[in-house]
Amino acid sequence: MFQMVEALVLVRTGSSETLNLMKTVKEEICKVKGVKEVYGVFGRYDFAVKVEAKTTEELGNLVTDCIRGIHGVVYTETLVIGF
């Protein structure tokens, strides 16, 4: 049986970003194919994003090409869900 690769992507924006830009970043993340849920969080990161992809390669492309390419995103950390 085929199983999708699921991950949590922790996203950090620039520390001086305005609330308006944060909302824009969240809206842009929500548009990315494969994004299932987006949460604003407190702490070192600004967003926790649940994503789904067919392969680990597709997951890598989703993060590097799509999420990291959004204006305002300065850093991501990806946690692949194992169980």
Region locations from a protein language model:
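A compositional/biophysical signature of low hydrophobicity enriched in polar/charged and small residues
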Residues: M1-F83
